Amino acid sequence: MREYTMRGTMAPTEVTRPLVVDDGRFTHGFIIEEMRIWSAGAALPTGFSSNACLSLYDTPPATMNAEESGTIAWSSWIENTTNGIDQFFIIDPEHVINQDLFLHNMGGTAMNYLIRMVPITMTPEQGVLQLVKAVNNNS
């Protein structure tokens, strides 16, 4: 199966970046397989820490809380002289993305990102269900 990647660098002042995946056909979507972030600059004397999340909405969530139902993936990168590098990413596997996606820089630091995804074709009913699920999840 073919894979797609989105990658780039976000400045410390860039809070939200739109990632266009919507091609206008709601029966075409993507499943996020991996989301990685890492430092985009030299580590600070005390280390580097960054948090990011992928969301279906252009407004960043207040926290990295799993109750933010429009958020579908979380990632963190911590680099310091004591513990080396610690990284994690968590992805909600039930989401099929068939609309635009937004990457939120929750750490206020310069970061690189790489998002790996695979395409999926759905029936019209499945596509509508994903759109309805996205709207209902934000309540």
Tell where the protein language model's regions lie, with residue ranges.
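Beta-strand-centric surfaces of beta-sandwich/beta-rich domains
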Residues: 1-139
